[in-house]
Design a protein with these regions (language model features):
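Extracytoplasmic gate region of multi-pass secondary transporters
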Residues: 33-35, 145, 149-153, 220-270, ...
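Conserved MFS/SLC helix-loop-helix module at the cytosolic interface between two early adjacent transmembrane helices
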Residues: 64-100
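Cytoplasmic membrane-interface "Motif A"-like loop-to-helix N-cap segments
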Residues: 74-85, 282-296
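Cytoplasmic helix-loop-helix junction between adjacent transmembrane helices
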Residues: 108-144
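Glycine-rich segments within core transmembrane alpha-helices of 12-TM secondary carriers
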Residues: 135-160, 357-368
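C-terminal transmembrane helical hairpin of 12-TM major facilitator-type secondary transporters
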Residues: 285-335
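A late C-terminal transmembrane helix in Major Facilitator Superfamily
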Residues: 343-379
């Protein structure tokens, strides 16, 4: 225990976390359509139905990418995958800066989604930093991503207020392209300077990646409870996506004000909340800390459902947005920390991250299309349908976390499960 407490972040580790955070921000180009829904829709002259279709098709592509991305990240070096991914992001961001319209948006966002990034990046960090620092590493990863994203968001807010949606989307995409280029260089330095002692030790045949071990992973209850619990918490992004147009349409906020709020929720909170989330998870445990963020999710949705949808109540609506965004930013570092907490085998770590990401994005494959059509058909009632479904989803997340909490107290983590399966074999 004393050795764990003495573990400290080195300059090299801080550099690795910052570069990966910058890269995470650069991949935000594929999230423009979610995080800056209003201005992207206007810049490309799209309808809510078309936006929903793009989001759904992109989500299907993401599910496919997460499936093969995690597996190849446990077979191919993270550096190789990340080099290809960042070069692709750089080129695609430049193309997206031309505001290409509906059909081209589908193609570009699908290409974004099909390019693996998250799983190899997490694997790179996992093999260059000690596991006892995982909470701190992933918390600061999100924070650095928020800091660099804040710069992008503020520049976009200025562009919206000064020049309108078309120019602001162009500015955003160019900045993402530049960040991709910088990260591409940084990844080469990290891979070159990584110390041998931080890399995994030589593994026996039973400890290497294999489809037999992968089959054990997908049968492990602890893994599924993490994957599903994180997925139900992640569904808050669906509600958060539609809160921005809701604020403009029903609460009387200007487009520039909503863009500024989007910047705060996407970037300012991303810089602050994950640091607290990592500290809180280290203090009381990752599983127990997740109750707080699921509670924020539920409180946010209850507020928005019970207040009158008029301009007089816009402050309550803004508070609801910030509360839900805080829930999502607090949940984010836990998605990886929980996998460490349940002692996921390192030879399957990227595969587990991939399965978690794949399960997490399955609702996106149909939810955005359904939500967009519901809003177009029912207006205000359509928005409320979205939030009512969100209540059911967050309750499901609480159930998963309660069961996981009980299993962890009984010592039934992934290492225990793999040992049991090994004895049976």
């Amino acid at each position: 225990m004393s050795e764990t407490k003495k573990a400290k972040m080195t300059t090299f580790m801080w550099f690795a976390v910052f570069i990966c955070g910058l890269g995470s921000t650069a991949t935000g180009a594929q999230s423009i359509i979610k995080n800056f829904y209003v201005i992207y829709k206007e810049a490309n002259m799209l309808t809510d139905g078309q936006m929903g279709t793009i989001l759904s098709i992109m989500s299907i592509a993401q599910v496919l990418s997460y499936f093969y991305g995690g597996i190849i990240s446990d077979i191919i070096k993270p550096k190789t995958i990340l080099t290809f991914a960042l070069a692709s992001y750089c080129v695609s961001s430049i193309i997206l800066a031309s505001n290409p319209g509906y059909v081209a948006s589908i193609v570009i966002f699908c290409l974004f989604a099909l390019t693996p990034f998250w799983a190899p990046m997490v694997k790179l960090l996992a093999t260059t930093t000690p596991p006892e620092l995982s909470g701190k590493v992933y918390g600061w990863l999100d924070s650095f991503s928020g800091l660099t994203g804040l710069f992008v968001g503020l520049a976009t807010t200025w562009a919206v207020a000064s020049f309108g949606s078309v120019f602001s989307v162009r500015v955003m995409c160019i900045m993402y392209a530049v960040m991709s280029g910088i990260t591409l260089i940084g990844i080469q330095i990290i891979a070159k300077q990584a110390k041998p002692e931080t890399a995994p030790a030589e593994e026996s045949e039973d400890e290497k990646f294999s489809f037999k071990n992968m089959l054990k992973l997908v049968k492990d209850p602890a893994q599924w409870l993490v994957w599903l619990g994180i997925t139900f918490g992640y569904t808050g992004y669906i509600g958060l996506t539609y809160m921005s147009p809701m604020l403009v349409e029903f609460f009387g906020m200007s487009q520039a004000s909503v863009t500024l709020l989007d910047t705060v929720r996407n970037n300012v909170l991303t810089f602050i909340i994950p640091i607290f989330s990592g500290w809180y998870a280290d203090k009381i445990g990752a599983v127990k800390s997740y109750y707080l963020w699921l509670g924020f999710y539920m409180a946010s949705i209850l507020i928005i459902l019970f207040i009158p949808w008029t301009p007089a109540y816009y402050l309550f609506a803004v508070a609801s947005v910030l509360l839900l965004a805080s829930s999502l930013k607090g949940r984010s570092p836990l998605s990886n920390t929980l996998l460490t907490t349940v002692r996921t085998p390192m030879m399957l770590f990227s595969t587990s991250v991939a399965f978690e990401s794949m399960v997490m994005t399955i609702p996106d494959t149909f939810a955005y299309s359904m939500a967009g059509n519901a809003i177009e058909k029912y207006g205000m009632t359509g928005y409320k349908y979205i939030f009512i479904v969100s209540i059911a989803l967050v309750l499901a997340g609480l159930v998963c976390n309660i069961i996981l909490d009980r299993r962890m107290k009984a010592g039934k983590d992934s290492t225990w499960y793999f040992a049991q399966k090994g004895e049976q074999a």
